[in-house]
């Protein structure tokens, strides 16, 4: 005698009709399909959550790195700042589209023009204006590697390329005229 399933045994005994058996089979199949879809949805949600976590982690790393660079730039400027006690010559420079002026002495003016010194923006307490500091060119190069927007004037960075067939190449325009 072959083994009968429980459903077949109940049908044979007359305890269940074939319609009820078919209905039970349909609901069982439906619940299996729903469970499979739920597992797939859970898996998809896990993947999406992992992707969001990865993006958030990357953003946090970038923010921490930017904060660290900002602190390094501030420290470099403060430690290497050159103070000028009695500046009597107004030195004009541009910061973005604004023209700013600091007072320097003759030697500092010559070094700024020659590129031995540079002017950096020192942000103080999240103030967008901040103040300006005169620093050595070697420090300006280090700062430019971390945050180029902090360097306002560095003659080595802003040197214009010479045009080979410029007819006025021999006539330099003096940038230290006193009016």
Swiss-Prot record:
Pfam families for this protein: DUF2058 (PF09831)
Region called Disordered, residue ranges: 27-54
Entry GO terms, CC: cytosol
Name the record gives this protein: Uncharacterized protein YaiL
Species name: Escherichia coli (strain K12)
């Amino acid at each position: 005698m072959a083994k009968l399933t429980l459903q077949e045994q109940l049908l044979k005994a007359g305890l269940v009709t074939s319609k009820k058996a078919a209905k039970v089979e349909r609901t069982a199949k439906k619940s299996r399909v729903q469970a499979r879809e739920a597992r797939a949805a859970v898996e998809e949600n896990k993947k999406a959550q992992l992707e969001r976590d990865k993006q958030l982690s990357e953003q946090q790393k970038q923010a921490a790195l930017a904060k660290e660079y900002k602190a390094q730039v501030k420290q470099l400027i403060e430690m290497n700042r050159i103070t000028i006690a009695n500046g009597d010559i107004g030195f004009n420079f541009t910061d973005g589209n604004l023209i700013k002026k600091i007072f320097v002495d003759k030697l500092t003016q010559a070094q700024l023009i020659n590129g031995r010194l540079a002017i950096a923006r020192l942000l103080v307490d999240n103030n967008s204006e901040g103040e300006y500091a005169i620093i050595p060119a070697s420090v300006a190069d280090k700062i430019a590697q971390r945050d180029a927007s902090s360097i306002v004037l560095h003659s080595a960075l802003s040197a214009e390329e010479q045009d080979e067939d410029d007819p006025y190449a021999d006539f330099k325009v003096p940038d230290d005229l006193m009016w």
